[in-house]
Amino acid sequence: MARTEALIISEELFRALSPVSGDLDWDYIWANILATQDKWIQPALGQALYEKIMSDIDAGTLAGDYKTLVEDYVARATVWFTCYLGIPFWVIKIVNSGVILRTVDDGTPITLNDADKIAQNCREQGEFYLQRLIDYLCANSSDFSEYQTTANGEIPASKINYAGGLNLESYTK
């Protein structure tokens, strides 16, 4: 399977920070990292900072404050949101004949309800680490000039993480 998009974290870092067994094939993980980057990480960083980080990763030049940001803050949020997105698909298998529960050699597969509970726990972990990321960026915005930079039509950096039933925070552009 050809992968053309860069991942913000490596397989080694994902496995070091996640509860995922080393037995799970990387092909089941990486697409969820891409989705996590699109759904949570890019909106938290803003498009300009996200593109700067991804460009540095592609070039192998990620260093200094940017490396600290990725390794200490972005990586943890990415890991937990990736698990949140992946768990439902790691429990099932989509085949030509339909959707089936996976079988395992060394245990009993969990129910979809149990998988959902575990996934929700992963989402809560991801939200915690995403808030830490946002707080860090707000406190250190002078270290990341791209964080406050938004060109017309770009995704601005979000300063809001948790979503509840009623948000009374004012919105300013």
What are these regions (language model features)?
Residues 78:
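Catalytic-loop motifs flanking and including active-site residues across diverse enzymes
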